[in-house]
Amino acid sequence: MSEYSVFTSESVSEGHPDKIADQISDAVLDAIIAKDKYARVACETLVKTGVAIIAGEVTTSAWVDLEELVRKVIIDIGYDSSDVGFDGATCGVLNIIGKQSVDINQGVDRAKPEDQGAGDQGLMFGYASNETDVLMPAPICFSHRLVERQAEARKSGLLPWLRPDAKSQVTCRYEGGKVVGIDAVVLSTQHNPEVSYNDLRDGVMELIIKQVLPAELLHKDTQFHINPTGNFVIGGPVGDCGLTGRKIIVDSYGGMARHGGGAFSGKDPSKVDRSAAYAGRYVAKNIVAAGLAERCEIQVSYAIGVAQPTSISINTFGTGKVSDEKIVQLVREHFDLRPYAITKMLDLLHPMYQPTAAYGHFGRHPFELTVDGDTFTAFTWEKTDKAALLRDAAGL
C-alpha cells in the first residue's frame, strides 16, 4: 500500500440501474440452477424507462416463469410504483434468451467431469488485504457499507423520503500501508420531491454516514458531499439505462486490485470469469489470513476448452513472509484451480448468486440459505478454512 497516500473507491445501491440488471441476471441464474444444477446460463439484462429486457444463452431442461421473476426482483428492490419512476408490476418484460452455442459446449463438457474445460479464455484476479476485518481494502468496504445502510434506512422507514437509487464514494488516507483517516465521503441518494435539502443532509449524515464509518477515522478536515447537486428525484432506470456487468470494479476490489475484465452476474460456474475470480479471492484471503502476507494479489488464466490454468502468479507487494515463488508453489499444492474442481471446492452448484449482485461479491460473511429444501452456504469463497494448513506448510 506504500505506493498510495490516499485511495478512493465507490459503490452503488441495489436500486442503481446497473445493479437492477445484475440482480435480475443472477435471479434468472438462481431460478434455473435451483431446478437444474448443471444448466448452462449466460443472462444479460437491460433496464430503461418502462421496460426490462433479458437476453443471452441458456441450456437447461428446467422451465421458469422468467417474466414473473423479473417483475418480483424489480418490486423487491423498491421500484413498485410510477411515483418512483419505475414499476415492476406494469413495466414491459421482453425475453430474448436463446440456447448456448454447441461449439462452446463441446469445449466445456467432458466424459470425465474433472476434465471439464474452461468456458472461455481469460484472466482473473483475486485479492486480499489485512486492512479491514473482512480482509478487503477499506475504501470499497466503507463504500459498500454506506449504500447498504441507505437501503436499510429506506426499507425500514427510518428515512421514509429515500428512494432506491444511490451512490457512495470514500477516500481513505494511508500511512505505512495502514488506513489512518477518511479524507472525503460522497453520498448521493435518490429522494422524494417533498423533503428539504437540510433534512436530507442531516438525516444522511446522522443516520447513514455516522452509523457506518468509524468515528476514529473521521477528522476535522474530512469533506462530506451529500447530494452535491442538491436534487436527486429522478433516478433508477428513468434517469439512466442499466446493463448487466457495468459495475465490475464495484463488484470486486474498488480499483485497488487489477481486474481481468469479465463480469460476474448472470453466469453459471462453468464460466471462469466468475468461478475463477471467486477462487482467486478464496486463495488470496487464505494467504493473508494465514499470515503469509499482508496483501496478496493472484492472477489465474485459462484457455477455452482446457482444464488446467495456463498460468498462476502471485504478488504480495513486498509484504510476504515467504517469497512469492514459494506461495505459488503452495497454491499449486493446496488449491485445484481447474473449473470443475473450483465448483466442487466452493460448492457453487446452488442458487446462491442473487445476494452477490449488490454490495460486492467479496468481503461478505458466509451464511446458510435454504431454497426449495436445498440447504447450502453462500459466499463460500470468503471462508478462511485453509489458512492454518497454508501457515504450517510455509513453516511459519
From Swiss-Prot:
It comes from the Bacteria. The keyword Transferase applies. L-methionine binds at E57, Q100, D240, K271. Pathway: Amino-acid biosynthesis; S-adenosyl-L-methionine biosynthesis; S-adenosyl-L-methionine from L-methionine: step 1/1. K(+) binds at E44. Its EC number is 2.5.1.6. Its cofactor is Mg(2+); K(+). One of its GO terms (cellular component) is cytosol. It catalyses: L-methionine + ATP + H2O = S-adenosyl-L-methionine + phosphate + diphosphate. Mg(2+) binds at D18. CDD domains: S-AdoMet_synt. One of its GO terms (biological process) is S-adenosylmethionine biosynthetic process. Keywords: ATP-binding, Cytoplasm, Magnesium, Metal-binding, Nucleotide-binding, One-carbon metabolism, Potassium, Transferase. It is an enzyme of class 2 (transferase). Binds 2 divalent ions per subunit. Binds 1 potassium ion per subunit. GO terms for molecular function: ATP binding; magnesium ion binding; methionine adenosyltransferase activity. It holds the Pfam family S-AdoMet_synt_C. Its main location: cytoplasm. The keyword Transferase applies. InterPro entries: ADOMET_SYNTHASE_CS (IPR022631), S-AdoMet_synt_C (IPR022630), S-AdoMet_synt_central (IPR022629), S-AdoMet_synt_N (IPR022628), S-AdoMet_synthetase (IPR002133), S-AdoMet_synthetase_sfam (IPR022636). It is found in: Cytoplasm. Catalyzes the formation of S-adenosylmethionine (AdoMet) from methionine and ATP. The overall synthetic reaction is composed of two sequential steps, AdoMet formation and the subsequent tripolyphosphate hydrolysis which occurs prior to release of AdoMet from the enzyme. PANTHER family: S-ADENOSYLMETHIONINE SYNTHETASE. Homotetramer; dimer of dimers. Belongs to the AdoMet synthase family. This is S-adenosylmethionine synthase. It comes from Pseudomonas aeruginosa (strain ATCC 15692 / DSM 22644 / CIP 104116 / JCM 14847 / LMG 12228 / 1C / PRS 101 / PAO1). The gene is metK.
